[in-house]
Swiss-Prot record:
Principal subcellular localization: virion
Protein name: Portal protein
Location within or outside the cell: Virion; Host nucleus
UniProt effect for mutating C145A: Complete loss of nuclear localization
Quaternary organization: Homododecamerizes. Interacts with terminase subunits TRM1 and TRM3.
Effect of C166A: Complete loss of portal ring formation
InterPro entries named in the record: Herpes_Portal
Protein role: Forms a portal in the viral capsid through which viral DNA is translocated during DNA packaging. Assembles as a dodecamer at a single fivefold axe of the T=16 icosahedric capsid. Binds to the molecular motor that translocates the viral DNA, termed terminase.
């Protein structure tokens, strides 16, 4: 398949490119533009990279073109051989080793005829395999001469595929000249020793040499334009294309493999990236939106607090602190009225039930009651206070009976007074709670109104900023789609949240994060990956190899892909002569030696070698036959019949019963001539 080539306008001067490509004449500049440059950035993964996009690495691989070039060189070299040259090299080899049929038979005269034929076949197979290896080494050197035009050369196949994937067309610059490929080929053919040692190689190189030099000149004279240093113009009125190198001013031609569509104001290319562009931009915008949401709304609020031990939490911890403050902890073992009173207050704070009041007060009175009630009174029975006697005993009995009653009355009075105080305090608390509840209701209403106003203001600001960003992106991409204009991202502020009122002695905040909604794009990425894979596989006719479990093992060019893309590369881009028939998809995955064997079997050289081998084996078998018996003894043995003698005559003898002319002399002379 040969793709159409554009016609370069030649009606104007070479240096008048700007005037030539004026919009008044119907010319528009289609490359470079923001859209076409973005296409190449997509191929480089600037807007994201998916698993399906990895198929493109196989598409732009030069493996298929390398195999096509190798097959062309192998075919040309092997088909340039002649029977005469092969026979001359074979006879020279036989003479050099002393393997003529007669000598071979004399050397193995005691062996059977079949064994001698096997030796002859083995001798020829050795020479044939050596010749094939020698020719392969020579052909490998020929292929290496075309390395400057390989994947990294000016006429590289990957650049050709890049242009097709982005725009569906290829700009080509031609300048007929001898470059590195031609010079390397000439030096190789001149200096290689095989051209002086083997007639087969020398004559084949001489016959195929002109074709090799034309192919090398095609590589040297062709340059696929670089994507970022070429201008492409299109005349939608005449359908013409113009290619110009802005650095050197050189003009070229444009190979249009997939014609684009002119919509009246712009050109829509028929290419894989053009078809995938809306989905790529949409998925990229979604990822950017999720990233902005993460930066804007996920500001971390870090609050680091120390956690108290179990022995220092609650009422017990407060009592321990008070003991330390008053200097009356377990270490000092001291006590005072102030410390006992503070402990009473702390114990009353930790009460959970009304019945705990009696226990709390009782423990306090047990601790301090001896100082308040059981203080020793003045003993009147002592000397100096009157008579002791019986009065002393009776006084002691009265005090012993009145002490428990007094202590119980004191406790009851203290408990009643505390209950009264607590009841009044609780009533005051209920009143305060009601007033605070009414105040909180009013504040909550005001807070809701402020929140609504804040949300409206935030939504309006975001909408204005989004509209401005969309307009900037459209101006950058030329209307092809949205793209980040390079604006600074919104700076996320840290939010301060006061949670102190919601914490008690048993809770603390180690770290806190806000978790707002962030859109998920995993499904969109998976869908885009499948789109990439389907588009590349179907557009470039890539063949997927799978095992018995259905798992993909490898992917390669199919026969259809070679005919659709590799053949136009040699015919329309390089304009290479006599490349030969396109290889098949199964040939692409072969190695160099495997491809050589496959080509070797299809050329005339294989037929010539088979014929020479058959003749050599036949000569050896003929030389191994025993000599025929001498006819002299049969003519003169006693009792020989005339019929037996007549059989040994030449084909020109007379018929049976005719008179013998010349007798046995002529017969003997004939036999002597036959022996000679």
């Amino acid at each position: 398949m040969t793709a159409p080539r554009s016609r370069a306008p030649t009606t104007r001067a070479r240096g008048d490119t700007e005037a030539l490509c004026s919009p008044e004449d119907g010319w528009v500049k289609v490359h470079p533009s923001p859209g076409t440059m973005l296409f190449r950035e997509i191929l480089h993964g600037q807007l994201g990279y998916t698993e399906g996009q990895g198929v493109y690495n196989v598409v732009r691989s030069s493996e298929a073109t390398t195999r096509q070039l190798q097959a062309a060189i192998f075919h040309a070299l092997l088909n340039a051989t002649t029977y005469r040259d092969l026979e001359a090299d074979w006879l020279g080899h036989v003479a050099a080793r002393g393997l003529q049929p007669q000598r071979l038979v004399r050397r193995y005269r005691n062996a059977r005829e079949a064994d001698i034929a096997g030796v002859a076949e083995r001798v020829f197979d050795t020479w044939r395999n050596t010749l094939r290896t020698t020719l392969l080494d020579f052909a490998h050197g020929l292929v290496a001469c075309f390395a400057p035009g390989g994947p990294s050369g000016p006429s590289s196949f990957p650049k050709y595929i890049d242009w097709l994937t982005c725009l569906g067309l290829v700009p080509i610059l031609r300048k007929r000249q001898e470059g590195g490929v031609t010079q390397g080929l000439r030096a190789f053919l001149k200096q290689h020793p095989l051209t002086r040692q083997l007639a087969t190689v020398a004559e084949a190189a001489e016959r195929a040499g002109p074709g090799f030099f034309e192919l090398a000149l095609a590589f040297d004279s062709t340059r696929v334009a670089d994507y970022d240093r070429v201008y492409i113009y299109y005349n939608h009125r005449r359908g013409d294309w113009l290619v110009r190198d802005p650095i050197s001013g050189q003009r070229g031609e444009c190979l249009v493999l997939w014609p684009p569509l002119w919509t009246g104001d712009r050109l829509v290319f028929d290419s894989p990236v053009q078809r995938l562009f809306p989905e790529i931009v949409a998925c990229h915008s979604l990822r950017e939106h999720a990233h902005v949401c993460r930066l804007r709304n996920t500001a971390s609020v870090k609050v680091l607090l120390g956690r108290k031990s179990d022995s220092e939490r609650g009422v017990a911890g407060a009592a321990r602190v008070v003991n330390k403050v008053l200097g009356e902890d377990d270490e000092t073992k001291a006590g005072s009225a102030a410390s006992r009173l503070v402990r009473l207050i702390i114990n009353m704070k930790g009460m959970r039930h009304v019945g705990d009041i009696n226990d709390t007060v009782r423990s306090y009175l047990d601790e301090a009651g001896g100082h308040l009630i059981d203080a020793p009174a003045v003993d009147g029975t002592l000397p100096g206070f009157g008579k002791g006697g019986n009065s002393r005993g009776s006084a002691g009995q009265d005090q012993g009976g009145r002490a428990p009653q007094l202590r119980q009355a004191f406790r009851t009075a203290v408990v009643n007074n505390i209950n009264g105080v607590l009841e009044g305090y609780i009533n005051n608390l209920f009143g305060t709670i009601e007033r605070l509840r009414e105040t909180n209701a009013g504040l909550a209403t005001q807070l809701q109104e402020r929140d609504r106003e804040l949300r409206r203001a935030t939504a309006g600001a975001l909408e204005r900023q989004q509209r401005a960003a969309d307009l900037a992106a459209e101006s950058v991409t030329g209307g092809c789609g949205s793209r980040p204009a390079g604006a600074d991202l919104l700076r996320a502020d840290y939010d301060i949240i006061d949670v102190s009122k919601s914490m008690d002695d048993d809770t603390y905040v180690a770290n806190s994060f806000q978790h707002p909604y962030i859109p998920s794009y995993a499904q969109d990425l998976e869908r885009l990956s499948r789109l990439w894979e389907h588009e590349l596989v179907r557009c470039f006719k890539i063949l997927c190899h799978r095992n018995n479990q259905g798992q993909e093992t490898s992917i390669s060019y199919s026969s259809g892909a070679i005919a659709a893309f590799v053949a136009p590369y040699f015919e329309s881009v390089l304009r290479a002569p006599r490349v030969g028939a396109p290889i098949t998809g199964s040939d692409v995955i072969l190695g160099e030696e495997e491809l050589w064997d496959a080509v070797f079997k299809k050329t005339r050289l294989q037929t010539y070698l088979t014929d020479i081998a058959a003749l050599f084996v036949a000569d050896v078998q003929h030389a191994a036959l025993p000599p025929p018996p001498s006819p002299v003894g049969a003519d003169f043995r006693p009792g020989a019949s005339p019929r037996g003698r007549s059989r040994s005559r030449s084909p020109g003898r007379t018929a049976r019963g005719a008179p013998d002319q010349g007798g046995g002399i002529g017969h003997r002379d004939g036999r002597r001539d036959g022996r000679r």
